[in-house]
Regions:
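Histidine-centered, metal-coordinating catalytic motifs and their short helical/loop contexts
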Residues: 1-5
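Interdomain helical connector at the RecA1-RecA2 junction of SF1/SF2 helicase-like NTPases
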Residues: 402-477
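Short, charged, amphipathic alpha-helical segments
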Residues: 11-15
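ATP-dependent helicase/translocase motor core
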Residues: 8, 19-296, 305-321, 334-338, ...
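A short hydrophobic beta-strand->loop->alpha-helix junction that borders the nucleotide-binding pocket
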Residues: 300-304, 327-329
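Conserved nucleotide-binding/hydrolysis micro-motifs of P-loop NTPases
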Residues: 164-166, 198-201, 304-306, 344-347, ...
Length: 477
């Protein structure tokens, strides 16, 4: 039952009803209660609605007529479907209504449901496009599935939709042709999307390879993307010596900037503990900001203490920038230039309804201690945001998991590495000396029952952290 104050739109209710129908039909078919998969028939929906009140009985009941036809064998060993309903997501129109419309709404777009209707700041459907290739469009006219317009009436993006049974690539060429025609007419090239509802790819006009995105960009995101097309490569590396004055720090920044100039969007720096990973990230942010590459930055760490420490350092060296912490601030400033958060807090934000941050809200995400467990447990963060992504770690290259390199789009090596041994040889770190110590805890071990409530809470936090770092599932002890 819907108990919230927000009214459910008729279209959303219709989509949910259809989805529920197919879930129920699938169960009934696999339990052999029905002989074939049924198609959803919208004509059976009553047009004269009366309000229905939920029953006070919380226990669901099942009709004996149904259970008598379902054998225990069918329930325990259900047969996979051998037929498909005639009405399904295979229809391009249904793909748009069930999947693409929903994604656009989540991104803040209001969809105009009258074909060809165009209003500033809204998503238009079946938009007439003139100047198409007459070899494939004899009249020279085509109709774009969606065009997203700026508040001033300029096309910010065009979307070509295909049904779920087709690859989104089948719509790529057509989407590009729509963009060509819109650019000739309006003087601005729209961002291009092509999608089948499950996989969506974007061509942003900045010469990056086509890339997959989880959803569509908001109105403000698209305006920022188009503005970024005017930025140049970073050729003058004005690195602030007050932040990073050591040679290896400057080399790390230069290596990463050169990598980004070559149209890569992800990178990894390996710097031994104590050699200034945070300072390097601050200096990199200042350099990218000065060259108009970034506006908003998200810094992620796995512990609140590390988030606080990072924010303190950023505030020290970039005092004029607005900063906030999602993990600590009572009322975080979500529009701040620099946002600091633990991974778990950010997961909560991107799972919130309504969505707290659009997919293009951040231009750069910095990951403190990038390794497999972070990508495994919190990978949804990096799938959700469409941004530059830089990983920092003290883990030596030889110990970095292959999947980490793949997720950062690297060929089994970081963009730059500065090892512990190099830091000692250069005089930036001192070698350690091992001193053997003993204690009651080492001799007797930790007995949970002997701990105070405060110690138990601390131990549980340590255990949760270790599980997260080692990728241990929640249900394993």
């Amino acid at each position: 039952a819907h108990t919230g104050a927000q009214q459910v739109k008729a279209n959303d209710a219709f989509i949910c009803l259809r989805a529920l129908f197919y879930v129920a039909t699938g169960f009934l078919y696999r339990w052999q209660a029905i002989r074939k998969m049924l198609a959803f028939d919208a004509t059976l929906i009553p047009q004269d609605f009366t309000q229905i009140h939920a029953s006070d009985n919380s226990e669901p009941t099942v009709s004996p007529d149904l259970t008598d036809h379902v054998s225990s064998e069918a329930i325990n060993h259900p047969e996979p479907p051998k037929s498909q309903p005639s009405e399904s997501l295979e229809s391009e129109a249904i793909t748009r209504q069930c999947l693409i419309d929903y994604m656009l709404n989540e991104a803040g777009w209001e969809i105009l449901h009258v074909k060809g209707d165009i209003q500033g700041g809204k998503a238009a459907i079946e938009v007439k496009i003139e100047g198409m290739n007459k070899q494939f469009h004899p009249s020279g006219i085509g109709y774009a599935d969606y065009v997203l317009f700026s508040k001033g009436g300029k096309p910010l993006a065009v979307i070509e939709a295909k049904s779920t049974i087709h690859s989104p690539e089948t719509g790529r060429k057509q989407a590009i042709e729509y963009a060509d025609c819109l650019e000739k007419k309006h003087g601005v090239r729209p961002v291009i999307y092509y999608t089948n509802g499950y996989t969506t790819k974007v061509i942003d006009g900045m010469d990056y390879p086509d890339r997959e995105v989880i959803s569509f960009h908001s109105h403000d995101d698209l305006e920022q993307l188009i503005q970024k097309r005017g930025r140049a490569d970073i050729t003058h590396l004005m690195i602030d010596d007050e932040i990073t004055n050591r040679p290896y720090q400057k080399t790390a920044i230069k290596s990463l900037v050169e990598w980004l100039n070559r149209k890569h969007r992800r990178g990894l720096l390996v710097l031994a503990t104590g050699t200034g990973k945070t300072r390097v990230s601050i200096s990199l942010c200042k350099l990218l900001d000065n060259n108009n590459w970034i506006k908003r930055v998200l810094f992620l760490a796995d512990r609140t203490e590390l988030v606080k420490q990072a924010r303190k350092n950023f505030e020290k060296y970039l005092p004029s920038q607005t900063m906030t912490s999602l993990s600590d601030d009572t009322e975080p400033n979500k529009s701040a230039r620099f946002v600091f958060s633990t991974y778990q807090t950010m997961i909560n934000y991107i799972n919130a309804e309504p969505v707290e941050f659009s997919i293009g809200h951040f231009d750069l995400i910095i990951i403190d201690e990038a390794h497999r467990s972070v990508f495994g447990k919190y990978g949804a963060i990096f799938q959700y945001f469409d941004s530059l992504l830089i990983g920092l770690t003290a883990t030596p290259r030889a110990e970095i998991d292959k999947n980490t390199f793949q997720l950062l789009e690297l060929e089994n090596e970081p963009n730059f590495e500065y090892t512990y041994d190099e830091a000692i040889a250069d005089g930036y770190l001192c070698p350690y000396r091992l001193k053997k110590c003993n204690s009651k805890m080492i001799n007797r071990g930790i007995r949970y029952d002997d701990l105070s409530p405060e110690q138990r809470e601390q131990l549980e936090k340590v255990w949760e952290y270790e599980k997260a770092m080692k990728g241990i599932p929640e249900d394993e002890e």
